[in-house]
């Protein structure tokens, strides 16, 4: 099996898979009571063997994902609904298995915002100018100070998110890039919390090197405290 064949969440740094770096953060966050991990079906056995080596107490289930991110999230929500794992008004957080540089403080802030206000996205400031193009021409320039990069985790009332996904299914909508986009489309006011700038999604070799750089930096800072 080559590295190119392996899903990115299973790439390792310091002897630990990226997905485990992610779960470690949620496992350590006090307000998180349970974790459902959604995974490419053909890699479920590999994931379960990986997690069996860890002493996780909050991982409730590992289940198969779908053909799209939207379908994978719905599979996770459906599992929770079917097995009555949470009350209808419970806050649920949706996170990427390849976004390991999240921290407990941001996870908690996102959960609190979702509980107190409504659907919440973790964001980071846009550091470059955002333009809209059409036919090779710039047709709009958005004021950078008002732009944010939508990231994860994203927090929701479980019942509201589940019902929105059911509505999308009924309408044959399979094109939502994330659940925040879905909730906004269906009329919900969406709130934001600031997350760490390094909270990137690892999708390229350069992203992985950035991840390694931040991990090395944190280790260096601990040594020289």
PLM regions: where:
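Residue-level signal for inorganic ion chemistry
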Residues: 10, 19, 76, 96, ...
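Short, flexible, basic/aromatic active-site loop/helix in glycosyltransferases
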Residues: 132-156
